[in-house]
Amino acid sequence: MFLSMNWIQDFVDLSGLDKIELIRKFSLSTAEVENDILRKGSEISGIVVGEIKSVENHPDSKKLHLLKIDAGEDELIDVVCGAPNVKVGLKTAFAKVGAKIGEITITPRALAGFTSNGMCCSEAEIGISDDNSGIMEITDDVKNGTDLKDIYEIDDIVFEVDNKSLTNRPDLWGHYGIAREFAALAGRELKPFDLDDLKAYDGLKKIDMKIEDTLCQRYSCLQIENINRNVSPVNMRIRLFYCGMRAVSYT
């Protein structure tokens, strides 16, 4: 089971403490931490919000586009991009010259006869999801030139716990239970877990059900209503991806 320190810190304030040391203490006192502790986001820098101001088709390529990007600087930046979802007004993750993605440092690069002074990135390229279908799409309310790490929880510390060591601890099968352990280790207060007033659901219509086989001692049903198909918030998608899961539609 992968665990996110950002998620844990929703429930306990660990500011000012050495998170790596806390994870090591957790491994010794509660459950074995497997493999390496991952510092997510440490491999990228210089990724900012860039707005596409113009789009032209490449004269010699059906796949490439010539873009002008507003990255919050005095002048627009010329970029060559082959993503299928480019359009004027789209804000995206833009790696400026000098930005780093893993072991790659972005430099001016000649592509099909034009110089690209940066790179428009997909979520997969910056390591926050496996979506490489096109460049990342960012909401219009974010200022051009804003560092992506200032608006999204890209920096995180993720560690993996051996499931076998938690078999007899169902209270640790989620981030809140793990946060309780960290609160004890750090001497910090555990924040209450807010729940809806369950009495508000007492009057719900019961599900009609008939058990025909007397050998069936119990059968449970759950009805879920008012589900929407909205895209999950970016930070939630990042957390799920870091923990080895994907945000998928119920359909």
Task: Kindly give the residue locations of the regions a language model identified.
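Extended, well-folded interaction surfaces typified by the phenylalanyl-tRNA synthetase beta subunit core
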Residues: 177, 236, 246-248
